[in-house]
């Protein structure tokens, strides 16, 4: 684990950093780098709606190609599925020996969708939290833990550069963990697919379906399997699984011990291993690339099917009654 004393901020302060993208992580990195005394420019395509926001926040903005030509450290924070084209069209033609190409996630490097020249340092700085939290913690004098990894290191100084960058966005205040592009990518994808997004979503929908099919009102089913999930996850987030079990009733704890293994059993773990193998051998990324090349038709169809599930209909109606719940723009419009 690395902390503030292990990183030299002057290293990144002596470089010119181009941040490509201004989404959740892009804005947090750019603003915190600037506040740490680093020269920063943001790369966005002509016509991007985010350009005005970048200028309003006092940052310089230009096209990705122009920023890549100006910078000697390029942090690529555009969506995973857009990165390969941005690299090919805007970044690669403007790379020079000694430049560094940074990522916030290892997918494109690990699976060979982006292949930088051997003379370029390739590293990753990945905060383990959303951009708004990274920025808020930085402003408060704190930080969010980060992962760093170095994939190509022609100068032998890649790790020091990555640590310096992590320090500039507050990561070393909390702690920085050294990893590899392989481990970060595969664990991140597995967590998303098997547990955080895919697994949790399907568990919630299955619980809702069983209750409604058994004759219970959909409103009650929604509260029991989705609305209250936040209460449980917050307890686990704050103090682990043991804290959650300590905080719930004895009835809930006892029932969970008995019934949880009936839902998530050895067969579930076998299927999780299959998901992990699909990630490790590149099958998932092949499907991801095929979807993009097909105009995102498969993703759009899956999205359509998902929003039409009854839990989404009853959920929107119930959230209309909850003044304390922050509503997304897409739902309030």
Swiss-Prot record:
<feature type="binding site">
    <location>
        <position position="131"/>
    </location>
    <ligand>
        <name>NADP(+)</name>
    </ligand>
</feature>
<keyword id="KW-0028">Amino-acid biosynthesis</keyword>
<feature type="domain" description="KARI N-terminal Rossmann">
    <location>
        <begin position="1"/>
        <end position="179"/>
    </location>
</feature>
<dbReference type="GO" id="GO:0004455">
    <property type="term" value="F:ketol-acid reductoisomerase activity"/>
</dbReference>
<dbReference type="InterPro" id="IPR000506">
    <property type="entry name" value="KARI_C"/>
</dbReference>
<protein>
    <recommendedName>
        <fullName>Ketol-acid reductoisomerase (NADP(+))</fullName>
        <ecNumber>1.1.1.86</ecNumber>
    </recommendedName>
</protein>
<dbReference type="GO" id="GO:0050661">
    <property type="term" value="F:NADP binding"/>
</dbReference>
<feature type="binding site">
    <location>
        <position position="249"/>
    </location>
    <ligand>
        <name>substrate</name>
    </ligand>
</feature>
<comment type="function">
    <text>Involved in the biosynthesis of branched-chain amino acids (BCAA). Catalyzes an alkyl-migration followed by a ketol-acid reduction of (S)-2-acetolactate (S2AL) to yield (R)-2,3-dihydroxy-isovalerate. In the isomerase reaction, S2AL is rearranged via a Mg-dependent methyl migration to produce 3-hydroxy-3-methyl-2-ketobutyrate (HMKB). In the reductase reaction, this 2-ketoacid undergoes a metal-dependent reduction by NADPH to yield (R)-2,3-dihydroxy-isovalerate.</text>
</comment>
<keyword id="KW-0479">Metal-binding</keyword>
<dbReference type="GO" id="GO:0005829">
    <property type="term" value="C:cytosol"/>
</dbReference>
<dbReference type="InterPro" id="IPR008927">
    <property type="entry name" value="6-PGluconate_DH-like_C_sf"/>
</dbReference>
<dbReference type="GO" id="GO:0009099">
    <property type="term" value="P:L-valine biosynthetic process"/>
</dbReference>
<dbReference type="InterPro" id="IPR013116">
    <property type="entry name" value="KARI_N"/>
</dbReference>
<feature type="binding site">
    <location>
        <position position="188"/>
    </location>
    <ligand>
        <name>Mg(2+) 2</name>
    </ligand>
</feature>
<keyword id="KW-0560">Oxidoreductase</keyword>
<dbReference type="Pfam" id="PF07991">
    <property type="entry name" value="KARI_N"/>
</dbReference>
<feature type="active site">
    <location>
        <position position="105"/>
    </location>
</feature>
<feature type="binding site">
    <location>
        <position position="48"/>
    </location>
    <ligand>
        <name>NADP(+)</name>
    </ligand>
</feature>
<feature type="domain" description="KARI C-terminal knotted">
    <location>
        <begin position="180"/>
        <end position="325"/>
    </location>
</feature>
<dbReference type="GO" id="GO:0000287">
    <property type="term" value="F:magnesium ion binding"/>
</dbReference>
<dbReference type="InterPro" id="IPR013023">
    <property type="entry name" value="KARI"/>
</dbReference>
<keyword id="KW-0100">Branched-chain amino acid biosynthesis</keyword>
<keyword id="KW-0521">NADP</keyword>
<dbReference type="InterPro" id="IPR014359">
    <property type="entry name" value="KARI_prok"/>
</dbReference>
<dbReference type="GO" id="GO:0009097">
    <property type="term" value="P:isoleucine biosynthetic process"/>
</dbReference>
<dbReference type="InterPro" id="IPR036291">
    <property type="entry name" value="NAD(P)-bd_dom_sf"/>
</dbReference>
<feature type="binding site">
    <location>
        <position position="188"/>
    </location>
    <ligand>
        <name>Mg(2+) 1</name>
    </ligand>
</feature>
<feature type="binding site">
    <location>
        <position position="45"/>
    </location>
    <ligand>
        <name>NADP(+)</name>
    </ligand>
</feature>
<comment type="pathway">
    <text>Amino-acid biosynthesis; L-isoleucine biosynthesis; L-isoleucine from 2-oxobutanoate: step 2/4.</text>
</comment>
<feature type="binding site">
    <location>
        <position position="224"/>
    </location>
    <ligand>
        <name>Mg(2+) 2</name>
    </ligand>
</feature>
<dbReference type="Pfam" id="PF01450">
    <property type="entry name" value="KARI_C"/>
</dbReference>
<comment type="similarity">
    <text>Belongs to the ketol-acid reductoisomerase family.</text>
</comment>
<feature type="binding site">
    <location>
        <position position="228"/>
    </location>
    <ligand>
        <name>Mg(2+) 2</name>
    </ligand>
</feature>
<feature type="binding site">
    <location>
        <position position="50"/>
    </location>
    <ligand>
        <name>NADP(+)</name>
    </ligand>
</feature>
<keyword id="KW-0460">Magnesium</keyword>
<feature type="binding site">
    <location>
        <begin position="80"/>
        <end position="83"/>
    </location>
    <ligand>
        <name>NADP(+)</name>
    </ligand>
</feature>
<feature type="binding site">
    <location>
        <position position="192"/>
    </location>
    <ligand>
        <name>Mg(2+) 1</name>
    </ligand>
</feature>
<feature type="binding site">
    <location>
        <begin position="22"/>
        <end position="25"/>
    </location>
    <ligand>
        <name>NADP(+)</name>
    </ligand>
</feature>
<comment type="pathway">
    <text>Amino-acid biosynthesis; L-valine biosynthesis; L-valine from pyruvate: step 2/4.</text>
</comment>
